[in-house]
């Protein structure tokens, strides 16, 4: 399952199946609407995605509430479809915090610095692999683990265009290609990973991979592209996005090299930063917190009539401009 499916499955497991007796919570892809329930559209896609075009021409009125997974995403949908702000809200994606002793992880002597990439290949793997290959010419004590496949969505054929890249990883002594594995296995691997290397080139509306890496205490290298800056909240090794892929790769090389030096120094300041990063991710992206926020949201919608009527909310006062 991909991120959207994982979020939906987790949400229902946290709130309980009974919530679906009253609410129709639709994760991104609308197939049919249940007029007998309160309808909540939970968007994970980009506004330009064809699956979102049903919101055109007032299509957003079919939903009692439209939920977005980042403020970046919310504002783009509002601009694209003219949706009123008060018809929407933001509920960040969430994770179960990764249980790892950062003092032990930080101070343990290792034979190599472990880099990891654990998202689909089209998001930046083609930039990462040649950069890492070049780094290996100068640094022998580094290793890259790649967990990347469209099989996570059941789209096996889409892997074919990246097969040459996968082969390059498999044939490199300092890289390991793991393909598709269950999310729990990735989280276990993150406990021993040092760097989440993510030269992202695809606009993310949210990034669960980054949340997990932050929780695992990994040094995270990525651009400030789309919603990544919002997810990172200034805790990571973030850089300004570069459209030119060649320039991007060269800049990312420097960031990767810097991370090697920083990790080898084992400075107290880095340790404090990574601990703060983990604390932030564990608190702010925690399912225990998000479950309560979702529960409060749904309770606030319970009174709404199933057929969506024109807003007749009684105003407390009249605000006059000028």
Where is each model-derived feature located?
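Conserved donor-binding/catalytic core segment of Leloir-type glycosyltransferases
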Residues: 106-124, 129-132, 136, 145
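Donor nucleotide-sugar binding/catalytic pocket of nucleotide-sugar-dependent glycosyltransferases
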Residues: 64-78, 83-100
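Acidic donor-binding loop of glycosyltransferase active sites
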Residues: 191-205, 218
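A charged, aromatic-enriched C-terminal amphipathic alpha-helix characteristic of glycosyltransferases
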Residues: 3-6, 267-308
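N-terminal pre-catalytic "stem/leader" segment of glycosyltransferase-like enzymes
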Residues: 1-33
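Nucleotide-activated donor-binding/catalytic signature segment of Leloir-type glycosyltransferases, i.e.
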Residues: 159-184
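Short hydrophobic beta-strand element within catalytic cores of glycosyltransferases
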Residues: 219-222, 229
């Amino acid at each position: 399952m991909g991120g959207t499916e994982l979020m939906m499955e987790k949400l229902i497991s946290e709130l309980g199946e009974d919530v679906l007796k009253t609410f129709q919570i639709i994760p991104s892809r609308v197939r049919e609407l249940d007029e007998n329930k309160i309808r909540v559209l939970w968007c994970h896609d980009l506004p330009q995605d064809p699956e979102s075009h049903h919101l055109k021409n007032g299509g957003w009125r079919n939903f009692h509430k439209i939920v977005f997974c980042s403020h970046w995403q919310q504002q783009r949908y509002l601009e694209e479809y003219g949706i009123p702000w008060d018809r929407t809200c933001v509920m960040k994606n969430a994770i179960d915090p990764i249980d790892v002793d950062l003092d032990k992880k930080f101070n343990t002597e290792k034979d190599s610095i472990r880099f990891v990439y654990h998202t689909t290949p089209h998001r930046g793997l083609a930039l990462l692999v040649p950069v890492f290959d070049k780094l290996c010419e100068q640094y022998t004590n580094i290793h890259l683990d790649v967990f990347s496949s469209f099989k996570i969505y059941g789209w096996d054929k889409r892997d074919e265009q990246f097969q040459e890249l996968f082969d390059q990883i498999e044939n490199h002594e300092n890289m390991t290609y793991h393909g598709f594995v269950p999310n729990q296995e990735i989280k276990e691997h993150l406990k021993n990973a040092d760097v989440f290397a993510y030269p992202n080139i695809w606009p993310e509306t949210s990034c669960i991979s980054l949340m997990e890496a932050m929780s695992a205490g990994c040094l995270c290298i990525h651009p400030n592209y789309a919603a990544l800056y919002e997810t990172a909240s200034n805790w990571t090794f973030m850089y300004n996005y570069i459209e030119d892929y060649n320039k991007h790769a060269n800049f990312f090389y420097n960031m990767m090299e810097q991370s090697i030096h920083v990790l080898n120094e084992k400075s107290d300041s880095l340790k404090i930063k990574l601990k703060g990063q983990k604390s932030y991710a564990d608190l702010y992206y925690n399912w225990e917190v998000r479950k309560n926020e979702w529960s409060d949201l749904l309770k606030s919608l319970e009174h709404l009539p199933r057929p969506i009527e024109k807003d007749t909310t009684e105003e407390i006062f009249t605000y006059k401009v000028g």
